[in-house]
Curated annotation (Swiss-Prot):
Single biological process term from Gene Ontology: mitotic nuclear membrane biogenesis
Keywords of the record: Cell cycle, Cell division, Cytoplasm, DNA damage, Mitosis, Nucleus, Ubl conjugation pathway
Gene3D superfamilies listed in its UniProt record: Potassium Channel Kv1.1, Chain A
Name listed for the protein in its UniProt record: Suppressor of kinetochore protein 1
Family: Belongs to the SKP1 family.
Native source species: Schizosaccharomyces pombe (strain 972 / ATCC 24843) (Fission yeast)
InterPro entries listed in its UniProt record: SKP1 (IPR016897), SKP1-like (IPR001232), SKP1-like_dim_sf (IPR036296), SKP1/BTB/POZ_sf (IPR011333), Skp1_comp_dimer (IPR016072), Skp1_comp_POZ (IPR016073)
Subcellular location: Cytoplasm; Nucleus
Protein purpose: Required for cig2 degradation in the G2 and M phases of the cell cycle. Together with pof6, essential for septum processing and cell separation. Involved in mitotic progression, essential for the execution of anaphase B; required for coordinated structural alterations of mitotic spindles and segregation of nuclear membrane structures at anaphase. Involved in the DNA damage checkpoint pathway and maintenance of genome integrity. Component of the RAVE complex which is required for stable assembly of the vacuolar ATPase complex V-ATPase.
Subunit structure: Essential component of the E3 ubiquitin ligase Skp1-Cullin-1-F-box (SCF) complex. Interacts with cul1, fbh1, mcs2, pip1, pof1, pof2, pof3, pof4, pof5, pof6, pof7, pof8, pof9, pof10, pof11, pof12, pof13, pof14, pop1, pop2 and tfb3. Forms a complex with pof6 and sip1. Component of the RAVE complex composed of rav1, rav2 and skp1.
Name of the coding gene: skp1
Pfam families linked: Skp1, Skp1_POZ
GO molecular function, one term: cullin family protein binding
Disulfide bond residue pairs: none
Record PANTHER family: SKP1 (PTHR11165)
Taxonomic path: Eukaryota, Fungi, Dikarya, Ascomycota, Taphrinomycotina
C-alpha cells in the first residue's frame, strides 16, 4: 500500500498508509481526481495534535465498511446515540479537543467520526436543564427572566414529564 504525506496547519508532516488517509472523503476524492500525489497534502484547518487523534481513529476503523452513501441502516444508526466502547474511550478528551475533532472530521469529510463526535456531544447534554448545559459549555445566559419564561411557555410541549 502506498504512503501519503499530510501536513498539518502547524507544519508537522504525517506519513500514513493511503488506506488510512482515504477514510477522509476529502483526501480520497483528491487522490481520485489527480491520481498519485508525490507532494505532501496540506491540511490548513487541522493542527498536528488534532490530526494525530483523527489518524488514530482512522487507523482503528481502517477496515470498517463505509460507502459514503446513506442507507436505511445508516440512518437508523445515526438516530441512535449509542457509541461503541473504543470510540467512547477515544472521545474521552477535554471539550476543546472534542470540538476540534468534530471540526476536523467535518473538514476532512469523515462522516462516521463526525457522527461519533456529535453523538458524544448529544450524550453530554441529554437530560440536562438549560442551566446545566450552559455550565457544561461555558455559555453565558443572555436572556432576561421574562424572555426565559416566554421561551419555557412556548416550548412546554417539548418538556419531559
Amino acid at each position: 500500500m502506498s504512503k501519503i504525506k499530510l501536513i498539518s496547519s502547524d507544519n508537522e508532516e504525517f506519513v500514513v498508509d493511503q488506506l488510512i488517509a482515504e477514510r477522509s472523503m476529502l483526501i480520497k476524492n483528491m487522490l481520485e481526481d489527480v491520481g498519485e500525489i508525490n507532494v505532501p497534502i496540506p491540511l490548513p484547518n487541522v493542527s498536528s495534535n488534532v490530526l494525530r487523534k483523527v489518524l488514530e481513529w482512522c487507523e482503528h476503523h481502517k477496515n470498517d465498511l463505509y460507502s459514503g452513501t446513506e442507507e436505511e441502516s445508516d440512518i437508523r444508526l445515526k438516530k441512535s446515540t449509542d457509541i461503541d466502547e473504543w470510540d467512547r474511550k477515544f472521545m474521552a478528551v477535554d471539550q476543546e479537543m472534542l470540538f476540534e475533532i468534530v471540526l476536523a472530521s467535518n473538514y476532512l469529510d469523515i462522516k462516521p467520526l463526525l457522527d461519533t463526535g456529535c453523538k458524544t456531544v448529544a450524550n453530554m447534554i441529554r437530560g440536562k436543564s438549560p442551566e446545566d448545559i450552559r455550565k457544561t459549555f461555558n455559555i453565558p445566559n443572555d436572556f432576561t427572566p421574562e424572555e426565559e419564561e416566554q421561551i419555557r411557555k412556548e416550548n412546554e410541549w417539548a418538556e419531559d414529564r
